[in-house]
A protein has these predicted regions:
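Metal-dependent phosphodiesterase/nuclease catalytic metal-binding core
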Residues: 1-84, 94-103, 124-142
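Active-site-proximal loop/turn and secondary-structure-junction residues that shape catalytic pockets
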Residues: 48, 88-89, 118
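Short, active-site-adjacent cap segments at secondary-structure transitions
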Residues: 90-92, 121-122
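Canonical P-loop GTPase G-domain recognition
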Residues: 109-120
């Protein structure tokens, strides 16, 4: 009580972004934007998963390659849930799952999910209920 009467601040406010979706972008968004690094839930593109397209070519065309994610894993340390999306149509959902399991480092694998591409009519080869992302996040933070 004496400290408060002296006008000394006893509380500190912290702002934590809950959700971030940087859109169709390169890995530099994670290097440049603190809000993306601090977001509890990050939706981010991951267009290329193998050597058919190089990381350099992916960046030149405004996309992210899995090597960019792996080489910059420390940028995702504060994200509690990461949802990859915007995959090249060359990848089927089962391939995406297998490649992510095989290539992602342990520090990322447990908090990563993916949404497969859908066609213009809204159907998907692996239907995903987006509301489940919030459920997965809630379960992972308990």
């Amino acid at each position: 009580q004496d400290i408060r009467n002296q006008g000394i601040e006893l509380t500190e406010t912290f702002e934590t972004p809950i959700f971030c979706y940087p859109g169709d972008t390169c890995i530099d968004v994670m290097q440049r934007e603190e809000i993306a690094r601090r977001a509890q839930i990050l939706f981010i593109e991951l267009t290329f998963l193998d050597d058919r397209v190089s990381p350099e070519s992916a960046r030149r065309h405004g996309h992210i390659h899995i090597k960019d994610i792996i080489d910059n894993e420390e940028l995702f340390a504060d994200n509690q849930t990461i949802v990859f999306m915007h995959f090249s149509s060359r990848y089927k959902p089962d391939q995406i799952h297998r490649i992510l399991q095989d290539k992602l480092p342990d520090s990322l694998r447990s908090k990563c999910h993916f949404i497969p591409n859908t066609n213009i009519f809204g159907s998907s080869t692996d239907p995903t209920d987006l509301s489940q992302i919030a459920v997965m996040h809630a379960q992972s933070t308990q």
